[in-house]
């Protein structure tokens, strides 16, 4: 009888040395799964899967143990490194993940609002989506669209320094001082990705995607 395995794996680009660490539940360690992150998928498409190697770092008997280890390994410092593909902090073991594995639940969430839909119907759909994280594919499409736009348009906040009062306002809004992780986004320096996200009115994950993207040289971590 097959037994579910809860794995922490690492994928390495043998050309540039960049790595991706993820969590995966499977009955077969050799199922060919190569991650779901936006950046790693883009890189595999660019370099070819033959230029990547995968190794199992840990194997657990429960998802709780797996996600706990992922949280320890894939922390904020890790995702901000220039040699990693991870854009999201690890440790996502929560009930939402379980629900999203149910096809009927996913279909229900993907219902698009149609013209003439009643207010009550819209309310029910909104309620169903509350607290549910968007898929990597959805986020990737939004990020791609935004990036394409700013290839031909100047971001209104590009190269605009942050005043002391603005820094203070952002810090207060984000709940105080954040861990020091110096980065530069579109000509503006920040002490933490959260500050950059607030300044550019995007999510922290989008900031990490910008930093890890090969086609955005003006977004990087300051060493």
Curated annotation (Swiss-Prot):
Its EC number is 3.1.-.-. Its cofactor is Mg(2+). It comes from the Viruses. It comes from Enterobacteria phage T4 (Bacteriophage T4). The lineage of its organism: Viruses, Duplodnaviria, Heunggongvirae, Uroviricota, Caudoviricetes. This is Putative endonuclease segD. GO terms for molecular function: endonuclease activity. It is an enzyme of class 3 (hydrolase). PROSITE patterns: GIY_YIG. Residues 4-87 form the GIY-YIG domain.
């Amino acid at each position: 009888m097959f037994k579910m395995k809860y794995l922490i794996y690492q994928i390495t680009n043998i050309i540039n040395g960049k790595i991706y660490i993820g969590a995966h539940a499977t009955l077969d360690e050799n199922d060919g799964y190569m991650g779901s992150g936006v950046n790693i998928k883009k890189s595999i498409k660019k370099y070819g899967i033959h230029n990547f190697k995968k190794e199992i770092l840990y194997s657990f008997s429960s998802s709780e143990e797996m996600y706990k280890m992922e949280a320890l390994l894939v922390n904020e410092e890790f995702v901000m490194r220039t040699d990693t593909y991870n854009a999201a902090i690890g440790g996502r073991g929560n009930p939402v993940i379980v629900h999203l594995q149910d096809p009927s639940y996913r279909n229900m969430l993907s219902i698009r609002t149609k013209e003439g839909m009643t207010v009550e119907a819209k309310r029910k759909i909104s309620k169903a989506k509350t607290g549910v994280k968007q898929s990597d594919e959805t986020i990737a499409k939004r990020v791609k669209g935004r990036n394409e736009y700013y290839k031909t348009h100047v971001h209104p906040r590009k190269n605009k320094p942050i005043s002391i009062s603005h820094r203070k306002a952002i810090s207060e809004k984000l709940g105080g001082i954040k861990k020091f992780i110096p980065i530069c986004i579109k000509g503006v320096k920040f002490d933490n990705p959260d500050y950059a996200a607030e300044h550019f009115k995007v999510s922290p994950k989008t900031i990490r995607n910008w930093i890890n993207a090969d086609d955005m040289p003006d977004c990087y971590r300051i060493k």
